[in-house]
Structures are given as C-alpha cells and as structure tokens.
C-alpha cells in the first residue's frame, strides 16, 4: 500500500529503536485523561499529566510512546482524547517533548493510524481526520520541523491525504507559539531577530540561511544539554557511591556485625577515586553557571571526605566493635556524612578554631574542606584550639589565649591542651556530661545557673570511666522500636516546624533499664528547613544519649506529597527512677533565617505508666 511506502521511507532515516519503558505515574494520569467512559474529557487530569511530563526527567521521552499507544486504541473516544492530550503537551511540555514528537519514530505511529496496511482499515473517520488535522497544523505552526513537513507531504503524494484540512476557527486549544518563551531561539536576542527576519522573507536563500541558523542553534543547545546531563549524572553517581561507601564503613562499628566484603569495598573506593578527575573536568567546563559549579564543588567535598574516611579506616585507625578510636571520636559514620561541617555550622555551643599560622604549627591547613575534616578528626592536617570526639559541643579555653583575626588561636600551650583532651588522664566523668570547668561560651539560658544539668548533641566519645556503662555500648536500630500507646509529647511547634517525642513499649534490646524515646521532626512550612541541630540536657542523676538523626534538613511542604520526617533516637538511663526532666536547645535555618530555640519538655507520664505502656 501507499502508506506502507511512506512508513518505510520514514523509518529508514532513523534507528528502529523501541520506545523507552513508561513511568507508572505518567500512565496513571494518562489513563484518567483518556478514560473512554467519561462523557467529557478530564482537563485536570490532562494538566496533571503535563506537569508530570515536565517534572519527571524521563517524562518527555516516555510520554510520546504512551500517547501513541492510546492514539492507536480501537475505542474512538479514547483515541480522540489521547490526540487532545498530545496537542496540549505540544503546547506546554517544552522543547524536549517537542523534539521527540517531531522525530520520524513517533510520526510513524501516527502514520499507522492512517495506513490501511496497519490500523487505517478499522480506525474511524473522526480519528483519522483528527490525525490529519494535527499533522497539518504542525506544518503551519512549526515550519522549522522539517521531518513533520516531509511526512505530511509524502502522505499527500501517496494519496493518503487528499487535501489540506481547514483548521476550525473556534479551536479549543490555542495555536502554540513557534517556540517557547524559554526557547534556545530567545537566548541570543540578535540571533532571534535575525531568524525572525529570515523566516519572513520570500527569498529561498534567506530560508536556507534560516535553516542553517536553526541547525546551529539546535546543535549548541544539544551540546549544552549533554553537558548538563553529564554533570547531573556525575553528581548523582558521586552521591550514590559515597552513600554505599558510608554504609559499608559503618559496618565496622555495628555490634555483632561482620565487616563488609573487602573486595566490594575496594571496588567502591576505586570508583570514587576515578570520579574525582571527572568532577575536576566538569568544574573547569562550568564557569558560566554559578549554581552548577556550586553543586559540583559540593559533590567534590562529599567525595573527598568519603575517600579520606576510607583511608582512615583502612589504615587501622578505626577498630571493629562499637567504638571508633580517638581519630574519629565516637562520631558515627552516618553523622559524618549527614552534614560534613555540621558541627561548626549549626552548633553554637562550640567554637572550633583551626590554627592556620605556620608560626604556631609549622603546617598550613590546605583548604576550608580540610579544616572541616580536621574538626571532625578525620584529616591528617594538624589542628589546634579544638577538641574531638566527645568535645564536639564542648571547648576547653585558656583564659590567657587570644583569638587572631584569621581565626587561629595564639596559645603556646595549644598542643598540650589538645593532648590533654585526647588522653586518658583527666578525672573520670559521667557519660555525656560536660565538665563544669569547661562550660561552653554559648550555653542555653539557664544552663550556667543550673549546674545539675548537662548537654548532649549526639553520640559523643565516652570518657575512660564510662566505657562499661550501658549507654556507651547501646545502639537501638530505628526499625526495632515498637511505639507505645501513650500519646506523644509536643516538644516544639512553631512556624510550621513541629517536633514530637514518642515513647516505646520496651527498653533498649539487652538493656531494659534504658528507656527508648523517638524524636520525629516534620515541617508544613512553605520554606525548607535545614541545618537542624537538636541538643538535650537531663539532670546529672540521669544519663542521655542521642543517636544520629536520619537527616538534617526538611524540604518545603507540598500538599501533593506526604511530608518528610526526620527521626532521631533518644536513649535515657534513669537509674534512680526520678521524675523525668528534659531541656532542649534547637537550632535551624528556615527560609534563610537562623533560629535558636531553648525550652523544656514537660508533662512526662509517671514512671509507672511509662513502664507499663
């Protein structure tokens, strides 16, 4: 048949590659938008489908094939609805969707509806008429799409299309502009004006020049898109590999768990090393986009930290068991990766000062990244004026020391102080307690006047005398917690940011005397919340330990998506069975504004009720 020749001629110009796999969410909205049982088309479903196409990175490539399947439906109403969705997408789904539809691969699917050899023998006249009308309208509205014009002209030559249809004056969907407002043709104002002038000309040489200009612009845009795609792919690969590396290294400190497979760990590490020059090349090629460059540098910081942590572990500076040696304090691997510089950025109870002066140390810390790593105890660069491990939220000051303008500490005994803090010589102190001689310079109100309280910001390194105390060895997985029937306590609830404290049915596994509590943080605010740091204090007759939080940031709330939740375990040892009192300090950033809140959790249930729950 004639249409067969058209399809064969068209297909010969491109690879016969099958359509990509559809996305479930796209199918869901398309099924609603093309439901043949509806008397009228669901325009809200069409709008949601278009939004999903624009949101999903693979939407512009998957959607045309989903639409082609619907257009070829034996049910007339479903096919007509799908053609309406196709027109809507051509108006609202951007250049990438447009380019997919303008390929011969997709145009062949429309030709099949018209060809008696394929579906034309049983497709209704209304469906075939709408397909012809759409193809003709595209040749009018998109003269730069040569493939659409060629396909339409070949159909006319073969007699499939007898004459050009008349476009209805009262068309439901307005004709789209020749290209979107954010199109590549508007990026350069001079080229845009030149192209407009050439397209309006009746001289063949001007039209040829316009065609060459369009091809050059499209080529430039494709090269730009390829760069963006490579950058996004590389950054995503860095994040995924560092996450895997983090999880494998965390096995070294989980009680009773075998170490990770060394061969697999080595493969992940080597891949991380190979990604570093890739990021360097991307950074050198991304000089005109500050946001993209910042994303690459952030990924490089994350990758560098993962590599350094791997080297620390493989050099034997981290031991098997529950605890990491003094090079890492007792900061868990997961916490290190949640917020590489979180201690310095969000914890106002500390003042980590890195001495960059060669006169004091003889070595210069090479970069801010290395300073951050040094503050976490995982850098080989020398650090002074700061503490590690249990002192993440504690500092030891010498009254005679003075701070230099560059942030260093002019203190001749800085090395000695650091050694004192890391050695086992200081007097024993209870787990997670801050010595009253080293009260932080920025303590929540009421703390200095309440010497019976101590502050805890996370799982800190235990002192020598507390190695055998329960909390030093206790770790409760989140999935093992069984919620109690008791209602949760509201810890904080302002500006859409809410923190609840939940109770568990049982104590910590193997340590029934340790009460397990669960903090949950969520946000219904339109702005994201980040750099979240939660600290707690209990009377000295009790002990408390905060396990790492699942995250340090919450996205902006969307009514179309379930709210994100941060979870953090709180372990409480109350050996004297006293009424529970708990104070907290909360710091976070919301909408670009920093917040620092202090309060006390009240209305704890009686111990008898708590134990029976």
From Swiss-Prot:
Record's compositionally biased regions (Polar residues): 399-414
Residue span, VHS domain: 33-163
UniProt note on tissues of expression: Ubiquitously expressed.
InterPro entries: Clathrin_a/b/g-adaptin_app_Ig, Clathrin_app_Ig-like_sf, ENTH_VHS, GAE_dom, GAT_dom, GAT_sf, GGA1-3, GGA_N-GAT
Top-rank lineage group of the source organism: Eukaryota
UniProt GO cellular component terms: clathrin-coated vesicle; early endosome membrane; endosome membrane; Golgi apparatus; trans-Golgi network
One family name in Pfam for this protein: GAT
Region (Unstructured hinge): 316-483
Keyword RNA-binding recorded: no
Residues that bear Phosphoserine: 400
Region of interest called Disordered, as start-end residue ranges on this chain: 389-414, 435-466
Keyword Phosphoprotein: yes
Single annotated GO MF: ubiquitin binding
GO biological process, one term: protein localization to cell surface
GAE domain: residues covered: 484-605
Record text about domains: The VHS domain functions as a recognition module for sorting signals composed of an acidic cluster followed by two leucines (DXXLL motif). The GAT domain is responsible for interaction with ARF-GTP, UBC and RABEP1. Required for recruitment to the TGN it prevents ARF-GTP hydrolysis.
Family: Belongs to the GGA protein family.
Function as written in the Swiss-Prot or TrEMBL entry: Plays a role in protein sorting and trafficking between the trans-Golgi network (TGN) and endosomes. Mediates the ARF-dependent recruitment of clathrin to the TGN and binds ubiquitinated proteins and membrane cargo molecules with a cytosolic acidic cluster-dileucine (DXXLL) motif. Mediates export of the GPCR receptor ADRA2B to the cell surface. Regulates retrograde transport of phosphorylated form of BACE1 from endosomes to the trans-Golgi network.
Assembly and interaction partners: Monomer. Interacts with NECAP1, TSG101, UBC and AFTPH/aftiphilin. Interacts with CNST. Interacts with GGA1 and GGA3. Binds to clathrin and activated ARFs, such as ARF1, ARF5 and ARF6. Binds RABEP1 and RABGEF1. Interacts with the type-I membrane proteins LRP3, M6PR/CD-MPR, IGF2R/CI-MPR and BACE1. Interacts (via N-terminal VHS domain) with SORL1/sorLA and SORT1 (via C-terminal cytosolic domain). Binds the accessory proteins CCDC91, P200, SYNRG, EPN4 and NECAP2. Interacts with ADRA2B.
The protein, known as: ADP-ribosylation factor-binding protein GGA2
């Amino acid at each position: 048949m004639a249409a067969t020749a058209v399809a064969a001629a068209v297909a010969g110009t491109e690879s016969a590659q099958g359509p990509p796999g559809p996305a479930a969410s796209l199918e869901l909205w398309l099924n609603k938008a093309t439901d043949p049982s509806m008397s009228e088309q669901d325009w809200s479903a069409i709008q949601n489908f278009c939004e999903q196409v624009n949101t999903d990175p693979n939407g512009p490539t998957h959607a045309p094939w989903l639409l082609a399947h619907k257009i070829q439906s034996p049910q007339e109403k479903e096919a007509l609805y799908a053609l309406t969705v196709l027109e809507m997408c051509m108006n609202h789904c951007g250049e990438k969707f447009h380019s997919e539809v303008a390929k011969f691969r997709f145009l062949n699917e429309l030709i099949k509806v018209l060809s008696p050899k394929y579906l034309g023998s049983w497709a209704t006249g209304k469906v075939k008429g709408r397909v012809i009308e759409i193809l003709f309208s595209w040749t009018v509205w998109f003269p730069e799409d040569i493939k659409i014009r060629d396909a339409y002209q070949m159909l006319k030559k073969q007699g499939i299309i007898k004459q050009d249809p008349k476009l209805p004056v009262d068309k439901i969907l307005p004709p789209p502009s020749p290209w979107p407002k954010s199109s590549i043709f508007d990026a350069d104002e001079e080229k845009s004006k030149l192209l407009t002038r050439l397209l309006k000309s009746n001289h063949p040489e001007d039209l040829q020049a316009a065609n060459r200009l369009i091809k050059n612009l499209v080529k430039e845009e494709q090269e730009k898109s390829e760069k963006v795609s490579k950058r996004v792919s590389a950054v995503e690969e860095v994040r995924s590999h560092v996450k895997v590396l983090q999880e494998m290294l965390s096995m070294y400190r989980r009680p009773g768990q075998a170490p990770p497979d060394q061969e697999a760990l080595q493969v992940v590490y080597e891949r991380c090393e190979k990604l570093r020059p890739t990021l360097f090349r991307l950074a050198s090629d991304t000089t005109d986009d500050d946001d993209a460059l910042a994303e690459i540098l952030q990924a490089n910081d994350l990758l560098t930290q993962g590599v350094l942590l791997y080297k620390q572990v493989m050099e034997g500076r981290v031991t098997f068991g529950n605890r990491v040696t003094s090079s890492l304090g007792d900061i868990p691997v997961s916490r290190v990766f949640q917020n590489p510089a979180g201690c310095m950025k969000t914890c106002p109870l500390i003042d980590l000062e890195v001495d960059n002066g060669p006169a004091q140390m003889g070595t210069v810390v090479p970069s801010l990244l290395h300073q951050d790593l040094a503050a976490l105890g995982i850098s080989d660069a020398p650090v002074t004026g700061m503490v590690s491990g249990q002192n993440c939220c504690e500092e030891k000051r010498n009254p005679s020391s003075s701070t230099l303008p560059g942030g260093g500490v002019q203190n001749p005994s800085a090395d000695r102080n650091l050694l004192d803090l890391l050695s086992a010589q200081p007097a024993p102190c209870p787990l997670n307690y801050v010595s009253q001689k080293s009260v932080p310079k920025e303590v929540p109100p009421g703390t200095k006047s309440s010497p019976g309280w101590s502050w805890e910001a996370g799982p800190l390194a235990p002192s020598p005398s507390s190695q055998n105390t329960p909390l030093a060895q206790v770790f409760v997985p989140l999935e093992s917690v069984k919620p109690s029937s008791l209602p949760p306590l509201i810890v904080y609830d302002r500006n859409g940011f809410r923190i609840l404290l939940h109770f568990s049915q049982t104590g910590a596994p193997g340590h029934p005397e340790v009460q397990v509590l669960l903090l949950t943080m969520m946000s219904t605010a339109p702005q994201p919340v980040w750099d979240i740091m939660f600290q707690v204090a209990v009377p000295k007759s009790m002990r408390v330990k905060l396990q790492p939080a699942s995250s340090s940031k919450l996205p902006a709330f969307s009514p179309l998506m379930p709210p994100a939740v941060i979870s953090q375990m709180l372990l409480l040892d109350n050996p004297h069975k006293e009424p529970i009192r708990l104070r907290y300090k909360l710091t976070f950033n919301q909408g670009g504004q920093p917040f620092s809140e202090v309060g006390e959790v009240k209305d704890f249930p009686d111990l008898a009720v708590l134990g029976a729950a």
